[in-house]
Amino acid sequence: AATAATSNMVRITLQEPVDAEIHTGVGNLRGWALGDAGIDKIEMWIDGVYAFDVPYGGARSDVGRAFPDITGSTESGFSMAYSYSSLASGDHSAKAIAYDNSGNSKESVSTEFSVAKLTEDFIGDPNAINLDEANSSLDRDEIALNDASVSNEPVDLLLKWRTAEQGFEIIEVRGGDSQVAMLSVRQELPVSSGSAIAATSDTVVRAVLEEPVQNEIHSGVGNLRGWAVASEGIERIEIYIDGEYVFDAPYGGARQDVAGVFPDVSGSAESGFSLAFNYNNLAAGSHVVEAVAHTKQGGIARSSSTFNVVKFSQDFISSSQTVDLKDASCVTDSTEIRIFNAVVAGDTYDVVLDWRVAEQGFEIVEIR
């Protein structure tokens, strides 16, 4: 959350990756920034080296409440989906630099974090994870899996509850081969340039919503992301949930995979849109998200996804509330982890986690 306790011309906070935590798979890279002169761009630096610009302009009502007198504070978020597995195993640092429209800049506090990695560049086969022969144990907010099979390699995994994700994240990997995961592989397109919507052979207008994933179950804080290209340029990306406009998505994230499919479309290499989204803010049950891309000449491209939400009784489990598994029991089967009698914020639940390719991790898919 934001606090209005500074008079600096440019303000910036990097919220994920979380300082002193362990990250793996596909997660969020996010924060917020403000400038009295408006924010021009956000740079992300990894291990002291410039990595990329992050799309800016996401909805942040909390920042707006903390800084009501600064124009644009309610659209001050920056966010993108990021494959932490594109980094080597071990310790890393990240910082964000905000530049305002007058040329001033401000660095965020550097975040020190670690990366744990699985066994391949990218696990694209949803059945490559097999827990049939795994042994499980539970302790406080952790799930230990011994002898899990990942692409036929025996691996021991440790998962831990993370407040930022509102779910369990892999924080330790033992066994197998540790050389894995490049972001460009994760984002390889399942479409060809021939599938683009075209008014003429020289005109392209295309939008693809990648998460939430069609017909899947989502819970906790995840990504809402995709890409859009147009020969005449993209003006904005609107997000509709269950037919109602909710916000614009920050646009302009690096997508070399899209550029490879649309090399002749200007801006295709920076065609991603993404934001961190708390799916628990929605009611349990079925929902539809639609992304509407508006071109600079008034054209429109749409892409939608129908999905389901499962959730605890609260929309957000704060860090002061307890996730306690010490008296729970656990069984594993295929790609699923089933936990019985878990205590979450004082209430008792049965919870099912399932392996998800998009996240490269286990997501909560059932809560009873």
Residues of each region from the PLM?
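Long, low-complexity serine/threonine/glycine- and acidic-rich segments characteristic of extracellular
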Residues: 1-368
